[in-house]
Amino acid sequence: MRYLYIIFILFHLAVASYGQSFYAVNPNPKYEVRAVWLTTIGGIDWPHSYAQSERSAEKQKEELRAILDRLQKANINTVLLQTRIRATTIYPSQYEPWDGCLSGFPGKSPGYDALQFAIDECHKRGMEVHAWVVTIPVGKWNSYGCRQLRKRFPRLIKRIDQDGYMDPEATQTGCYLAEMCREIVQRYDVDGIHLDYIRYPETWKFRISKDQARGNITRIVEKIHQAVKKEKPWVKMSCSPIGKFDDLSRYWSHGWNAYTKVAQDAQAWLKDGLMDELFPMMYFRGDQFFPFAIDWKEHSYGKIIAPGLGIYFLDPKEGKWNISDITSELYHLRNIGEGHAFFRNKFLLDNHQGVYDFVTAHFNRYPALVPPMTWESNKRPQQPVTLCIEENEGTTTLRWDNSLQYEDGTAIKTPSIYNNVYASKEYPVDVHDARNLILTRTTRRQLTTRTGNTPTYYAVTTTDGFGNESRAKQLNQTAVVKTATRYGKACRLTTTGESIILPSSIHETDCQYIIVKNMQEQAVYITKPQNRKINIKKIKDGIYTLNCVNYRNIEHTLGTFIKKGAQKK
């Protein structure tokens, strides 16, 4: 604790110089959460138009694509997408109705699944997407979502002034929210469940002790955690607690904190494994920010902390902050090993006081990977089994195939396997240097770039759903080849249904690996040739190509074959 307070004091001495001396300590971290809250309530971040026809739905989609393109340019790697709004959703739920932000009419479909669309678009850009679930508030008392929920569970909703809230003291609240989160995780390839307002309303009249109140909120978190992790243990559990956990020995929270005021025992959730990640809402300055950020780090228990920054205060309509308030906070967070999250998307992309330019051109100039959840799994995937390069006029195409196993030989069970691509003018490529990252978290198996005048060296790694990264498969520039034609045109191969015999033109010493690919050019089976016979018994029925990778990492297509059932009409 004393050491971090010394850092805090020294940091303030450095703020006068815009934080540059501290920034030089680790200017380009390879692992860092860089997040943004993308708010859908009222369309305040997105969407700004309604989907009431096929054409208007496409306009809505194009707006989100444009937003994500700009976030990608700023090297944002995590999008917190508001999914459950106020007892309403942006996806077809069996529990709650559509929110009106998409179609303009509460309860009416916009004609497409906005959550699925957002997931697809985020993943195309190498970004994680977390379903942001607003938990306790359910909107105005007479709003559509609140009315529908009150009809089904009249005793579950409490009224405070004009607003409705799920009762945090009712056992059914945790069960209901857990089922909603289970529905999302079962149906969608989300990377996280992000709980918002998982606390008592600050105006709640407590009739129980604060310890009992904290126990009630923790039981809700436990139920949601169990539901999510039972379905997919690689899905991150996170929440956005009040930005100051509690009063510190030297700094007062001014009565606004998570632990005492609203019964959020968020640091215990990290310790007990109920949360993988926290996004504390630290919309403060000075001694209401810096020491409390250190406190979150000191009580992170090896988990991920990415404080939320109140960049909306840069807008003169919202506050009177200066850009230096935000930049000094960013420098501080990086130096103590925390990530950052911007509240919210509009204020980042509107570039108030140049904040977007600062992040894009300077602070987040290079990509970063989301830290792995080693507390859930620390198995290391096998490195890509093949990596080859092909040069055509003016372009260079890098191709690779993944193993579907960990280094210990067990199968990778996460549904998606990702790759990171590195490039450098030096060999071997230093994959610990974020400046060499050119493509992150991609599900593609090839990359085409313009051919430069100087030699470029490449390396590719594999990551699983937990974020564990393999050793690098390095490719020396001497491996560059033209389109391989050694074995002539690909031919039709015959099969017994359980095995294939390699063509007579192929010698075992020519092949390092045999790869079976489907018609989408995805590797479905990788093996080493033995006795010229390739066992395909475990491959599903279908049409495939058989490919050979030689010891120079050059891949050739040997031919095509049909696995038995695909031949039936």
Stretch-by-stretch model annotation:
Residues 31-33, 37-62, 130-187:
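Active-site-adjacent "subsite" loops/lids of carbohydrate-active enzymes
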Residues 62-88, 187-190:
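Catalytic domains of carbohydrate-active enzymes, especially glycoside hydrolases
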Residues 74-110:
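Aromatic-lined carbohydrate-binding/catalytic grooves of carbohydrate-active enzymes
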Residues 128-140, 194, 213-259, 304-308, ...:
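Aromatic-lined carbohydrate-recognition surfaces of secreted/lumenal glycan-active proteins
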Residues 266-267, 271-289, 303-376:
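Substrate-binding cleft of secreted/luminal carbohydrate-active enzymes
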Residues 358-411, 467-483:
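Pro/Thr/Ser/Gly-rich low-complexity, intrinsically disordered linker/stalk tracts
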Residues 449-469:
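Beta-strand-rich modules
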Residues 482-487, 543-569:
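C-terminal tail/sorting-segment detector
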